[in-house]
Amino acid sequence: MSKMDVGPLVPSGLMVVSVEVGAAAITLTVRRPSLESACPTCGVVSRRMHSRYWRSLADLPSHGRRVQLRLEAHRFRCIDRHCRQQIFAERLGCEIAHASARRTARLDSLIHHLGLALGGRPAASLSRRLMLPVSKDTLLRTVRRHFVRSRPSRSGKSPPT
């Protein structure tokens, strides 16, 4: 099989370790290039690695196949003795994926917009054709999660957007 350019498949901020191309899916093993992370409680940057674990993230399809990111994530020890957070997991950043997400931010955004534009069943039907197998309920949950209510101010006018 010829070499495939995986650059566009990988969200920025991740480095490709290996690529497995199957008949139905492309699996990219990725990791963050830096081996340090800031403690979410105190903000001190730590390089003291505690352990590592694997996360699996679904991403946008490519070349007629599903794309799965197998991410090597790390846990670090906080180096501030007074911090109550002794061990923490590195944050990927909202441009890659949210804390406990199983989909990348760009796939989640596409699913959100499909659900917003078409609603439950029509969006689920189109998403299957686009190789994004999500249920109508997942589409509607994603729309609700992204929905931000704008509360009127005390004067009765909506806040500026």
Predicted regions and their residues:
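Short, positively charged, Gly/Tyr-enriched micro-motifs
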Residues: 46, 54-160
